[in-house]
Amino acid sequence: MIILAFESSCDETSASVVLRTEVGFTVKSNIIASQIETHRLYGGVVPEIASRAHIEAISRITYEALGVAGVTLADIDLIAVTANPGLIGALLVGVNFAKGLALANSIPLVAVDHIKGHIASSYLLENAPKPPFIALAASGGHTAIYRVDSYTKIKTIGTTRDDAIGESFDKIGRLIGIPYPAGKGFDALSREGFIKATGDEEKFYEKYKKSPAYKDKEMTLPSPALSDGSLDFSFSGLKTAAINLLHRFEQKGEALDRSLFAARYTFEAVEAVAKKIKMALEENPEMGFVMAGGVAANSHLRRRLTEVCHSLGRDIFIPPVSLCGDNGAMIAAQGYYEYLEGNLADSSLNASALDSVE
């Protein structure tokens, strides 16, 4: 089966051609038109601008994806498209374009939930996970833990009660001079801080908690892991405390070591996620773990969650960094399983900004 898939839920327009055989998935093309440079001017995504950019890009990248894959629309067996959640204007561009192609060429169409798509990025791995397993979806808009019972049925077992981890990195990163989106720069600056704090270029994360920098009361930040026994997070408190810390340094006229600050912020965020993932795995014996979403590209989070899984003897599945962000290939993978379940869409398909993962 050859699948053509579209992703346009936020600020990246993607079209991908994926081949599914008895062996598994093969990504034949995965074209992504990024809007980062455009939105960087505003310090974040502007929905109206994002929608217009999707309109300008989607036809071009579709034919580029087909060309790179060496196929035509006549070869396509299935079209998949992200229908929710996301920016409504952005989603509508992808949904309407996909519907038009499907109807005009008599190709079956399936709608895909964006979060399920992120989790499905792991199905593109050579050694792909099989449900049931525990999954983390961490991005600029989501931070949640799921129990994946089957390829199409998942249940939310933990979530953020306010801000997403990626949004907090972007906000705090901007305040210390890291250009939007701050994820990659924050990761690198944190690494610099960890090494500075420990003097170790290899085991810097593991040694950080015993370093003088961690014990510095001027840099104290709260954990976003709620202590109520749930698997939920609250990143707003961490973010607010970090903003107040920055203001204190500014008011006292003291120079802030950006790298040590970034390391402390990253450590608290990552440790909170690690704590909840460990709890989730302990509550679900023998299940493996999938890490997905844009923040899954964070090297410190990847490192720490790998350590957690190994300590519990669980398998961990992490997509390559190239598949952590929004892309069409992950939508194709999930679309395949929606098709097998008979979850076909028709001309009445509409986009929704709301999360309906369950």
Residue ranges of each PLM-predicted region?
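N-terminal beta-alpha supersecondary unit
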Residues: 2-85, 114
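Short beta-strand scaffold segments in enzyme catalytic cores
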Residues: 13-19, 135-137, 143-147
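A contiguous, well-structured pocket-lining segment that forms one wall/lid of small-molecule binding clefts
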Residues: 30, 72, 188-289, 298-312, ...
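Short glycine-rich phosphate-binding loop at a beta-alpha junction
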Residues: 73-83, 285-296, 317-320
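Conserved phosphate-binding/catalytic loops in two-lobed NTP-binding clefts
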Residues: 111-112, 289, 306-331
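Conserved phosphate-binding catalytic cores of ATP/NTP-utilizing and phosphoryl-transfer enzymes
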Residues: 112-134
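Glycine-rich phosphate-binding loop plus the immediately following alpha-helix
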Residues: 127, 150-197, 239-240, 244-250
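Glycine-rich phosphate-binding/hydrolytic loop that grips phosphoryl groups
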Residues: 320-357
